[in-house]
């Protein structure tokens, strides 16, 4: 779960490397005709580009990743506590089976101070042929957190210089 957020932050500063990191941390989730609500990786990358690197001041959220770190919220300008910590909670549901990957997956809540709900859903899977867990779906992470209040500014080099 944390690797996806780190990859998103790397993508914000260094898009070529960040995109490679995102591909390593997530599954091959190209458009599935049986799941029309699922976005392709190309569409996700386009969304992340607009959100993390975009020039539209009303849409871009360069502080998106910070909003998922403990202690960060809109009122404090998304300044997280140190050491940087990502908080997750397991959803109260059973494992589900994915026949394409011959694996079970589970969903978690990633806590955030950037949304009214206080959390977003992320789905993690361990493919049968891999020793690593991968993020299979993370739509909330690439939907906007609340914008900074008018008096707050964002330090673009907070995490990566």
What does each model-identified segment do?
Residues 61, 79-82, 126, 138:
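Intrinsic-disorder/low-complexity coil detector
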Residues 63-117:
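Acidic, glycine-rich flexible loop segments
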Residues 107-109, 114-161:
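Short beta-strand edge/turn micro-motifs at domain boundaries
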């Amino acid at each position: 779960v944390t690797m996806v957020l780190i990859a998103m932050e790397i993508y914000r500063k260094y898009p070529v490397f960040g995109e490679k990191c995102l591909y390593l941390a997530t599954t091959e989730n190209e458009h599935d005709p049986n799941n029309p609500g699922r976005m392709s990786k190309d569409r996700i990358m386009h969304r992340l580009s607009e959100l993390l690197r975009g020039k539209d001041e009303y849409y871009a959220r360069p502080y998106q990743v910070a909003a998922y770190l403990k202690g960060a919220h809109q009122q404090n300008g998304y300044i997280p506590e140190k050491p940087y910590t990502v908080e997750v909670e397991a959803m109260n549901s059973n494992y589900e089976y994915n026949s394409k990957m011959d694996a079970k997956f589970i969903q978690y809540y990633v806590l955030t101070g950037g949304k009214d709900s206080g959390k977003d859903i992320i789905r993690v899977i361990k493919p049968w042929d891999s020793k690593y867990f991968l993020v299979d779906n993370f739509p909330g992470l690439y939907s906007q957190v609340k914008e900074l209040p008018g008096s707050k500014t964002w330090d673009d080099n907070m995490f990566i210089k």
